[in-house]
A protein has these predicted regions:
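Positively charged, low-complexity intrinsically disordered leader regions
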Residues: 1-36
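Gly/Ser/Thr-enriched, mixed-charge loops and adjacent short helices
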Residues: 2-11, 32, 121-269
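Buried hydrophobic positions in well-ordered alpha/beta secondary-structure cores of metabolic enzymes
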Residues: 19, 55, 95, 108, ...
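Short glycine-rich or small-residue beta-strand-to-loop segments that form or flank ligand, phosphate
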Residues: 24, 52-58, 126-128, 208-212, ...
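Glycine-rich phosphate/diphosphate-binding loops that line cofactor/substrate pockets in enzymes
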Residues: 38-53, 195-205
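N-terminal small/polar loop signature for handling phosphorylated ligands or for N-terminal nucleophile
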Residues: 54-121, 224-286
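Phosphate-binding and adjacent anionic-ligand microenvironments
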Residues: 271-273, 277, 286-289, 310-491
Length: 491
């Protein structure tokens, strides 16, 4: 093995966002661009010699090339073992599961999540730490600092790994283990949920489920778990083959982009349960027949019905939600007498709460839900959670949610997404608006009196770290809110 040291120079645009570094594929295809970020990541970590690294991605265009580069750089930087999903594939939840199960030092996940893929689409990379969760801000800031001073990177001069062959291979002094990307995750799901009850539900001819994988990573996971293990009808999983361009679609599971599923769920022949996941498998949308469940209501209903699921039947330690998520989960936490934490958007902010057992279930406004079973949000886990609730309660989705509203009240909101706006214009709008905030407190807007106006700041109750400028908030005396924030996941 020959380790090469390649001279390079910094790129000024490599600051990680809410969930890693996301740019157009053409940006990542620049000479040294990916390598600079990977080396800057390794340099931000403590001694990696002899450690294990998990590597995988959502299968979008540029994924396999990036996996090969990362493996060669990991070998050059001293890792002794790499665990890689077959064909370079791992959903983000599965990657978190694998990191935790095999006690890896960390992992590199290749995904731009719900963003479009293909040669003209987006690509992304992020580092997850040993607990399986996204790197906290202290590490991402160190990575960014390194990208601004990098002068060289290390890579082994060796051939490519055969990513399609399960088993062990050698790359320099590093062992590369190619694993089934679904197996470990499926085993974890079987430990959490009552698979027998769900299997019985799915065998009932009156019950039908449709799962839209949107030509992204969750297709193989859905087919194996829903159809092969739990016995759902063949064809339950639609758009189930991962494509490098996601079928030229936008794999964001919402009412706009999951149109095929939504049209079926609001038809006369609607299945009992409809669900969709996104590019890397960490988001979910839940639908009943002619009924849409908002992300915040989904989290609230899941928390209120935790006793239906074996892994959570002994109770929840707490609930955590992102600041823009509606306050529906707060009502459940109050009734259960447990903590409810409000964090900035970004799953990395839930990690400390989960590790410290201050929260069991977490959710955010962009169709993300998860729990302490891993340290990422988890789309298919949420679908199985709803199936478990339906199997126990033997009611429809609409009946369960409407009964929830009767008990806890209903939180209404509307969300408006403004996409592909030039970032400088969006930032200036936010700056100008915030400048007016001091004069708004005490005023009435549309008949509602403003009680506070601020830029959300979060103090982590576990490590006391402070995250500022996490979104503009206008709060009213009746408890209603107006929230504005810049996306940290767009390109």
């Amino acid at each position: 093995m020959v380790t090469q040291t390649i001279v390079t120079s910094p790129f000024n645009d490599q600051r990680p966002g809410t969930s890693g570094l996301r740019k157009k594929v053409t940006v990542f295809q620049q000479d040294h661009y990916l390598e600079n970020f990977v080396q800057s990541t390794f340099d931000a970590l403590t001694d990696v010699n002899g450690k294990t690294l998990v590597v995988g991605g959502d299968g979008r265009f540029h994924n396999e090339h990036a996996v090969q580069v990362i493996l060669k750089m990991a070998a050059a930087n001293g890792f002794s073992r790499a665990i890689v999903g077959q064909n370079g594939l791992l959903s983000t939840p599965a990657a978190s599961c694998v990191i935790r199960k095999y006690q890896a030092f960390g992992g590199i996940i290749l995904s731009a999540s719900h963003n479009p893929a293909g040669p003209s689409g987006d690509f992304g990379i992020k580092y997850n730490i040993a607990n399986g969760g996204p790197a906290p801000e202290a590490i991402t800031e160190a990575i960014f600092a390194n990208t601004q001073t990098i002068s060289n990177y290390k890579i082994v001069d060796d051939g490519d790994i055969s990513l399609d062959v399960i088993g062990s291979q050698t790359l320099g002094d590093m062992t590369v283990e190619i694993i089934d990307p679904v197996e470990d995750y499926a085993e974890l799901m079987a430990e959490i949920f009552d698979f027998e009850a769900i299997r019985s539900l799915l065998s009932d001819d009156s019950f039908d489920i449709r799962f839209d994988a949107m030509h992204a990573i969750t297709g193989p996971y859905g087919k194996e778990i829903l159809e092969n293990i739990l016995g759902a009808k063949a064809g339950t999983v639609i758009n189930g083959t991962p494509l490098t361009d996601f079928g030229n679609g936008h794999p964001d599971p919402n009412l706009t982009y999951a149109k095929e599923l939504v049209d079926e769920m609001f038809s006369d022949q609607a299945p009992t349960l409809g669900a969709a996941s996104d590019g890397d498998g960490d988001r979910n949308m839940i639908l009943g027949a002619n009924f849409f469940v908002t992300p915040s209501d989904s989290l609230a209903v899941m928390a209120a019905n935790a006793q239906c699921v074996p892994a959570y039947k002994s109770g929840l330690s707490g609930i955590a939600r992102s600041m823009p998520t509606s306050q529906a989960p707060d009502r459940v936490a109050e009734k259960l007498g447990i903590e409810c934490h409000e964090t900035p958007t970004g799953w990395k902010f839930f990690g400390n709460l989960l590790d410290a057992n201050r929260a069991t279930l977490c959710g955010e406004e962009s169709f993300g839900t998860g729990s302490n079973h891993i340290r990422e949000k988890d789309g298919l886990w949420a679908v199985l959670y709803w199936l478990n609730i339906l199997a126990v309660r033997k009611q429809t989705v609409a009946e369960i949610v409407e009964q929830h509203w009767q008990e806890y009240g209903r939180n209404y909101y509307t969300r408006h997404d403004y996409e592909a706006i030039p970032s400088d214009i969006a930032k200036q709008l936010m700056t100008d608006l915030e400048a007016h905030f001091p004069s708004l407190v005490g005023q009435s807007l549309a008949g509602k009196r403003v009680s506070y106006a601020d830029n959300f700041s979060y103090t982590d109750p576990v490590d006391k770290s402070i995250s500022k400028q996490q979104g503009l908030r206008l709060g009213f005396e009746d408890g209603s809110r107006i929230i504005l924030r810049l996306s940290g996941t767009g390109t």
